[in-house]
Structure formats: C-alpha cells, structure tokens
C-alpha cells in the first residue's frame, strides 16, 4: 500500500467489512485502513479472541488504548488490504472527547486548609495526651 496512488487503493464499504467477522475471515479497520487478520489470529500475543471481538468493525480506539509497540505497528502494515470507503468514514463512531471538570478555587479552601489543620491539631493533642500518661 505504501507509495501507491489513490487510484490504486482498494476501497471497501463498511457493509462489506462487517461480513468478515469470523475465524475464517477476520477483517478490522484501523485508522480507516482495512486489515485482513485471518492469518494472524493464532499469532496475536493478546490471543485470538481479542481480534475476533473487533472483527468486522473499527478497532482503532482499542488498538491505541493497548499501546502497541513500533514493531507491532510495522507488522500490522503487512496485513493492509485496502481502505474504508470515504463515504462510510462518517458512519464509524468517533471516540468521545474526554470531559475535564474543574473545581472553583474558592470552594476548596475548606478542604485544603481547615480540615488538614484540624486533623493535625487532633493528632498533636492525642500525641501529647499519650506522652503525658507515660
């Protein structure tokens, strides 16, 4: 696939890819590229079941979550058979954006200063009482 022009690229529809989701024919989509992993099932270090769960669909998010090595990424290129048709790319669910929440600084002074101060005072008082008994 490397170095090929756009007209040499074989495009597959999402419907066609979804038909290849068993051990006899296992296709997945990674970054809009279509991979035939049928011959790789038994070699996969994470086990064949991991690949079969993703078969026939987009495995990009799961592939990236695992944190595959550079060698694994290079090896994966040997299984590319084409690309997802541009018309079907919008049909793939995009990963949701991470929601980041912040706490207002004026509301956290209580937990940042008062509670630790009271806790330290209580510990000091208990220590003093303990030492006084000896």
Curated annotation (Swiss-Prot):
List the Gene3D superfamilies: Cytochrome b5-like heme/steroid binding domain (3.10.120.10)
Q: Which residues form the Cytochrome b5 heme-binding domain?
A: 9-85
Write out the residues that bind heme. 44, 68
One Pfam family name from the record?
Answer: Cyt-b5
Q: Which residues carry this modification: N-acetylalanine?
A: 2
InterPro entries membership: Cyt_B5-like_heme/steroid-bd (IPR001199), Cyt_B5-like_heme/steroid_sf (IPR036400), Cyt_B5_heme-BS (IPR018506), Cytochrome_b5 (IPR050668)
> What is the membrane topology listed in the Swiss-Prot or TrEMBL record?
Single-pass membrane protein
Sorted UniProt keywords: Acetylation, Electron transport, Endoplasmic reticulum, Heme, Iron, Membrane, Metal-binding, Microsome, Transmembrane, Transmembrane helix, Transport
Report the residues modified as N6-acetyllysine.
Answer: 7, 10, 19
NADP: is it a keyword of this entry?
Answer: no
Q: Name one GO molecular function term.
A: metal ion binding
Where is the chain membrane-spanning? 109-131
Q: Among its keywords, does the record have Kinase?
A: no
The UniProt similarity line reads: Belongs to the cytochrome b5 family.
- PANTHER family linked to this entry: CYTOCHROME B5 (PTHR19359:SF150)
Record-given protein name: Cytochrome b5
Originating species = Mus musculus
Lineage start: Eukaryota, Metazoa, Chordata, Craniata, Vertebrata
Q: Which gene encodes it?
A: Cyb5a
